[in-house]
Amino acid sequence: MCQKKPFYITTPIYYPSGNPHIGHCYTTVACDSIARYRRMQGYDVMFLTGTDEHGLKIEQKAAEKGVTPKEYVDEIVKTFKGLWKFMNISYDRYIRTTDDYHIETVQKIFKELYDKGYIYKGEYKGKYCTPCESFWTESQLIDGKCPECKREVTEAKEEAYFFKMSPFADRIEKLLTETDYLQPKTRAVELVNNFIKPGLEDLCVSRTTFKWGIPVTFDEKHIVYVWIDALSNYISALGYKNEKFDEFDKYWPADVHMVAKDIMRFHAIIWPAMLMALDLPLPKHLAVHGWITFNGQKMSKSLGNVVDPFVLGERYGADAIRYHIMREMALGADSAFSNEIMINRINSDLANGLGNLVSRTVAMVQKYFGGTLPTERESGEFDDDLIETATSLRAKVDDFMDKTQLQNALAEIFKLVSRANKYIDETAPWVIAKDETKKARLATVLYNLLEAIRIACTLLSAFMPTTMPKALEQIGACEKCAGYENCDKFGVLPADVTVHKGDALFPRIDVEKEIEELNSIIKNNEGESEETKALREELEGVAQIGIDDFAKVDLRVCEVKTCEPVKKSKKLLQFTIFDGVKDRTVVSGIANYYKPEELIGKKIILVQNLKPAKLCGVESCGMILSAVHGDDLKVVFVDNMPVGSKIC
């Protein structure tokens, strides 16, 4: 196969403020699978990952432990690299923002943007979120908190350098709305409406209130703010403005940046603006995925709901974990993680599906032919359908991989696995074996199964790189037979192929027993935070009701027409609400969470048949539905349903 063009794929560089968990794994495993698949196709692949090691949070964490920031990140980086080795991640380069060559690149980029007039000195006044290392304006806050992580923000005022964003607003809007740069493209609307339409504000790109960062060469009391520092890794790692590497012209622009949705804005808006200012080509695709959630929440050490991938991998093998997280998550959507979902997926797809197919087929070749098939063949019913399913598979998987739809690619491969298992039931080799005159037909059935397994396992080797070579060895597929170039062909294995019995690829798991042990090891309850524990205990104490009780509550979509504070009360707001038939007055104690003007015109959910009650002299005819978590409260808004719609 002729050499194809270079292919450059990147993960975000991870922030090493603590040890990695399974939530970190998805992006890296997904990128690794794409990189491996492209290598199979003959591409010259550069797969980059790394760590973002500067900032106030690192400085604070190091101080807490009594070590220097560099000593602190050195230890955490060992854990990240150890996890990637454990998960069989085939990255080509690991960049650290503390590397000398990266520092050189960042300083040169900052100076060039300053010389071009895109960076200027001013004074920053506003809000700062330390965990996200992000500046926000008052209008961008949600309930006074960081819109990304929902944590408290602090007042910040300091001399700073700013990057002019507005000159690039039109080009960025076209990039998001008129090209396939952003995947899934549905996210473009929220970015345009939330950040570009209101007017791109200049970006604070330096700090003076902490020292752990890259100094600005011409004003060393300033350090380069995290996003110019971190985002530049994608080009510094190729040798842009440094002499460490000489591969920028070869690999840039990147084919795929893959990131989680919480850093989408930086990669969809800030990074393109930086590249435009530098007169550099833009990346081809930004693939944005959701979060792996646990009990409905994003995995977070602060919530005590993280899952240790080392524990899972040691019990089930890294390939099973790789498969599970890729099979469960669709691009752009969140994916719920639970021990039960994971174990059932491993059992159904890997143990009962693929593993059973391989072991049954190999066992039958050994039982009926001593491990080596005869060369005589006899076609029969069901052969053509299996062969068509197998030979058409590669093109379908190629298409999904081109779209970074790994979940769909895996689902397509397992259609072949299911078809092959069905073929066994349809042809019943154990029945054919009873007729001595049908040896050729029996050999054909088993050969067809081996070929289907060869194609499936070859394509799956990008996703499960440890186990699939073992499967291919068991069915007697040599390295050449197991090549990508042969995945659209049938009849590649030698006619007299010899199989080799091996250990079970994916042993079946006792679900109940394993969940009990996992709960003990991972400490889903004992290791939970006080916040999660309190919530669990609260939920456990809630009395159950029947459907008849629930049916008595009339919940309707209503529209807020007016809203104003209630006199003599700091907590109450008075609403005029239209329920689809008439206006009604409602009083709600949410004044500490919303300004009246924020609620006018909104569609909310109202408990309509609540007995009227007087609050501060105002009769309230209903109750507005809100969600409460700790000290936080949010009204439940309904955007796309007509007023008067019943909630059921």
Stretch-by-stretch model annotation:
Residues 2-76, 95-111, 115, 132, ...:
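N-terminal catalytic cores of NTP/NDP-binding nucleotidyl/phosphoryl-transfer enzymes
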Residues 78-90:
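A glycine-rich helix N-cap at a beta->alpha junction
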Residues 116-169, 173:
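Cys/His-rich short segments
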Residues 121, 328, 333, 341-378, ...:
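Helix-rich, typically C-terminal accessory recognition domains appended to large enzymatic cores
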Residues 471-549:
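Intrinsic disorder at enzyme termini
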